[in-house]
Amino acid sequence: MENVILNCQNLYKHFGKKEILKGISFEICSGDILGFIGPNGSGKTTTIKLILGLQSIDNGSVEINGFNVVKNFEKAIEKVGAIVENPDLYMYLSGYDNLKLVANLYKGIDSKRIDEVIKLVGLENRINDKVSKYSLGMRQRLGLAQAILHKPNLLILDEPTNGLDPEGIKDLRELLVKLATAEHMGILISSHNLAELESFCTKVCIIKNGVIIESSEIDVVKSECSDSYYIFDVDDSKKAQPVSGGGLPPGGAKLVNVSQHAVSSLA
């Protein structure tokens, strides 16, 4: 039986009269890497903030390791690591000193664990350099090291590929796969670009205007769309289907109410 780490059920969130989330549900199990995909303003970051208790939930529930985030916040959040937006780093300190500061916030993190995490993220040769000398990709890896020091089983990353070059994205991809397998983590990674995530995610959820319009195993998406997968923005998907006729691209298409930000080749 799969070990469910994160369970989000029927989440709603309003800001004033604007409805941001409209009853979204999904779950993450141990070893899952879930790509949470959607254009800017779709509700990705709001969802993450609800999961982490940074914003209040209007309706619905979030459970982490069986603990309700609202009713038992400390227990729910104790095995969670997260980077929302950019890693929080002291640029004038070394990478090692940054990790020591975070380690002091928890009980039981010794130098052996710090060294273990440094090796895991591949910063052994630069860990004593000042962070100001790090590349963006190296800072991202140091941020990940901070997030996993206390051995969480859920890792949440909000748009971690922003600003990374192709080599940095490749390094991040390999590191996340290693964490999911070696550390048995469940990982939620948000992005507006499915193409950056589809090669290593095990699941995908596509969100638009606060609604999840596609949720499945990534292998299922690939098998259904053997050549390319296209998502078109239409006013009425039922009416558009017969009209599309032979104009559909090879490999199939899905006609839903979603921005073309989600269009991606899944060859």
Residue ranges with predicted function:
Residues G60-K71, K75-A76:
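Conserved ABC transporter NBD signature motif
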Residues R173-V263:
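ABC transporter nucleotide-binding domain
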Residues K100, S111-R126:
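Conserved ABC ATPase "signature" region
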Residues K151:
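Conserved catalytic motifs of ABC-family nucleotide-binding domains
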